[in-house]
């Protein structure tokens, strides 16, 4: 029956399988290692691993034959059993042994025989992992060399540059000795960590432990300890720290060893408990578990995954159940010997045995794939030539071997949390000499309250610190303390003073931007009378400046004088209370100083409404200049305006304001030097409550049109900047509103709508100005739909600087050069125009001199006032056409004008022959004077007399064109006397005569006879006695209205000339008047007065002084 079972695999497959002989070395009855690697609780792991190998079809053509030997962890026995397995049993591979000394012996023999060996369990000596000495040995255990590297990384991580080591070989002669060797080697090979002191305890007792702790307290504060497992040594050590008074925050203890359960202790029945609850051992400390647990709070454990709390996964549970049950199978046949309940729990490192055998199966599969000959099964060098692998193990998570067969191990650092419960603090992956540290704690506060120092500040003896300065220099200390207190008081006083002064300074600065309304004086616009007072020499102005006096208030602004400066006060229809943050904003705004920012003066809070005050710019806004200025803009002029706006925006974007938020061309003001100054910035708290006009939204970016509550950003200013640039280049308003059919509402809706081709202004600049295409591209980038795609103001400035073409002149210089060029080109045209002007001026002067006396006209042209002038002796001449009303009734109006023009042309020719000034003609009335404005002595009477005689003689030959049969006759009156002459009126100014002599001359004409020259007694005396040469005849006494009875005369002619009227007209000799009373003669005088007043000449009486003013 047994033979059949042995032959069944071969019969089932139809062919005989090759056999791999496997030698197994175990420790069967050694009590110290039974729980970890005991034969009865671990050997069956090779059968479970064989099943996995078959399931993965790694060695389908091979079967395994197992030979079991027991070395009991002794090197002599292990060496002998190894020789038997190799020479007698002819095995292909040896799995084991499980202890250090036995493992070194087997590894040496395997290297000699070139047999592959896979060790596991407690083989932790670093020498076993030396590939150069033992090239055919693979160890799956965590060695002490790797553990030493992990300790060094932890020490470096917490800046501990020195440590001490306490260990004992009591109960385990191999583990701690190997750990000591590797720590010593690590301290020698690395300068960053030093092993300062080392103590070995021969027999572990409480006294020995306390003595050792007292000794090391003089050499170190970071203490690494190593003791045998399962005998209560570690708990006794921790308890000894309490008894020795060394469980304080000044110390840190570390257990760094392989095959450690950390803060857990295994129980025989498979369970576990905390180390401070361990009852194993004969140590009576007198301490409670709570005291010992508190001391464990100063302990760190560095060990493999055995330190983790036991977790039973389904895979491990299946492995554990098979491990115990299959010990009864071949080749172990452990039935009675394994029936004790002690052997019902798998050994601690049984999983490593599974991993070791499975790793061999993978390595053999690879070697047989390369060379399937039978001879290579036992060739250790060939089997391990491709040993590098990684797989999921049963005993320790992922198993990774490098190309030399050295396992890349992962160890863990465990600590107690604030609740004094174990937790995983960090992970350390050790690959050769490299260590990767991964912390799982949030901060070091999870590990300790204060990190311990490797060396106390005052040294281990406490004598390295300098002596207490206070005790040594008590007097000086007291003096220094007093000085410090006084200094602190002075500092506090200074701080309070500084704060007080700062508060006062803030209040002072607040007074600067809070302008009282009483200190503002409104600019008064000029009255109409003042506006009309222009001299004859003044001409129209061509300046582009805005005279603030021309208008004192607009819809949005009122202009005020403040401290001899003109301010523009922006109106805000609201009343607000400002908090400290807003006041700080106003203070900072008032301190702004930039060439392209309009100065913010402050706010007026106590006026009829809220005013924000800004400096007045004489040329108005950019919008005004574009819409009203006739000044020609070339490309450099436009570029300079755009550059000024970008400079102002750069300052705003880099200030605390971050953005303007409401930038329009109306905010861009222009000063005397044609420099743009941005106004209206800041005042966010004020603008929040204002409703902008539709026209002001034409510059608003689409994102703010869609959401009015969205915060204004610098990208929005860039959009507004692009709209303003389009206004400058096209020399039109935003979106060319005046020449569009759409209203602002429609345009704003289209901009808000957006889309693939959003609404934007035209950039058609015409052919008169050459614009850089790069500038047009920049403007289009500025108003792109997505804010994130718009350039920043720094980028805009960079692009503009690249377009300067090397020109560095400013705009004012450019304007001067442009005006100079313009002046030179117009020089010839001005010269021609000047010649024409001189000719026209001559014509104007001739006309003016005919209307006014030359002397008077010259004064008026110079803008001088013509003062009234008194002339003591002049001769006044009045004439009137007899029965002109009857004659005019026979003519049309045009014929009347023709008649008078023909007549006056003859008269004007006669006047030019004499020193006579023609004052005025009214209808058919004629007024002349001689002796003014140029005085001519007594010759004035001669010139008037000759002119009068000439008038009468010229009528003999004068004929009316349309009435040839009609004859014209004149009545002439002459008087001599004093008059006052002057210019009266602004519109159509006239040179007028004032005086009684004027009225008397008028009465002479009105009381005269047709064809006669009627003169007064004064004129007669001048004619006959003063100048002589004229013949006159007395008319007698005549009643003159306003004069009473006057004696008058007829001028008959000049003695040297033929008399115009040789004889006086015959009149009936009046009867002597009868005596009548004054009362009875009055009606007669009134009737005579009415008859003598007939005529078309009108005289105007001045009721204030009784003089006649003829105009």
From Swiss-Prot:
Phenotype upon changing residue 88 to Q: No effect on chemotaxis to alkaline pH. No effect on chemotaxis toward Na+. Normal cilium localization
Primary subcellular site in the record, as a coarse category: membrane
Site note Involved in sensing alkaline pH, residues: 145
EC numbers: 4.6.1.2
Occurrences of domain Guanylate cyclase (ranges): 875-1005
InterPro entries found in the cross-reference section: A/G_cyclase (IPR001054), A/G_cyclase_CS (IPR018297), ANF_lig-bd_rcpt (IPR001828), Cyclic_nucleotide_synthase (IPR050401), Kinase-like_dom_sf (IPR011009), Nucleotide_cyclase (IPR029787), Peripla_BP_I (IPR028082), Prot_kinase_dom (IPR000719)
Glycan-carrying positions: 65, 130, 318, 340, 365, 379
Protein kinase domain residues: 482-817
Gene3D superfamilies in the record: 3.40.50.2300, 6.10.250.780, Nucleotide cyclase, Transferase(Phosphotransferase) domain 1
Signal peptide: 1-14
GO molecular function, one term: GTP binding
Chain positions covered by the region annotation Disordered: 1061-1082
TM segment ranges: 474-494
BP GO terms, sorted: cGMP biosynthetic process; chemosensory behavior; chemotaxis; intracellular signal transduction; receptor guanylyl cyclase signaling pathway; response to alkaline pH; response to lithium ion; response to salt
Residues the entry annotates as binding ATP: 488-496, 545
SMART domains (UniProt xref): CYCc (SM00044)
Membrane-topology annotation of the record: Single-pass type I membrane protein
Biased composition annotated in UniProt, kind: Basic and acidic residues: 1065-1074
Tissue-specific expression: Expressed asymmetrically in ASEL sensory neuron.
Keywords noted in UniProt: ATP-binding, Cell membrane, Cell projection, cGMP biosynthesis, Chemotaxis, Glycoprotein, GTP-binding, Lyase, Membrane, Nucleotide-binding, Receptor, Signal, Transmembrane, Transmembrane helix
Protein's cellular compartments: Cell membrane; Cell projection, Cilium
Comment text on domains: The extracellular domain is required for the direct sensing of alkaline pH. The protein kinase domain is predicted to be catalytically inactive.
The protein's role, per its UniProt record: Guanylate cyclase involved in the production of the second messenger cGMP. Regulates chemotaxis responses toward Na(1+) and Li(1+) salt ions and alkaline pH in ASE left (ASEL) sensory neuron. Directly senses environmental alkalinity in ASEL neuron which probably leads to the activation of cGMP-gated cation channel tax2/tax4.
Subunit structure: Homodimer.
Record's protein name: Receptor-type guanylate cyclase gcy-14
